């Protein structure tokens, strides 16, 4: 069940003070983001075309979900948790935002699936060693203390289990510009997020036997920026970007085959095997 308030002080008391404060800030800022979202968006048929493609790819990397014990880290509205539960997984979803958890609970109820929802940061997982068969973490790792989160992921994931992550890449030029002028756009972001670089994967390699990564998307970031110039884009703009994405996404896949360009992709997708 979702909690009624932000991450509680007593739950963060064992963490370094600076990390505890960072988590509190993330919780408060994410609460504000999710309060602005309409309840009408809690609908699997209304998922944004870009997010839908990204989620589909990530869930496929998780393998057979039937009966699998899955930890979904930073679940937001609960989209991925509900989709994996519908596929037969036993899903535990964690979030630092109580507002997001309440939305995720509503989504789960709408689709009649059971989720174990807990208010918890990825840097302090209150689970026993080897609890989970898989971990999914979409657009959340870059909000965390990466070294500590990597340790926690490796600890609670069983031997042979898989971690799948997608996060923004720090070195994509259009995305870098987009982040710098994000206040002009209706960009949902928190103040302490840190997009990943390839060298950041060293923390995962300390706890996982194999860590593979690939770049995802290149020019497509421009379509998202175009949409978000306005908080409520005209339907014709959305139709244009959705149609254009059908072309830019496969084009991006071709472009990113060129040696060296993987490092300037918009997103970095990681599959780590323990």
Features from the language model and the residues they span:
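Conserved class I S-adenosyl-L-methionine
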Residues: 2-65, 164-187
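Class I SAM-dependent methyltransferase SAM/SAH-binding core
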Residues: 71, 77-124
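A short acidic, Gly/Pro-enriched loop at the edge of an enzyme's catalytic core
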Residues: 123-134
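A short SAM/SAH-binding and catalytic strip from SAM-dependent methyltransferases
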Residues: 134-146
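A short glycine-rich, Lys/Arg-flanked "PGG" loop and its adjoining helix->strand segment in the class I
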Residues: 148-159
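Short alpha-helix
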Residues: 193-209, 213-214
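A C-terminal cap/extension of S-adenosyl-L-methionine-dependent methyltransferases
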Residues: 218-274
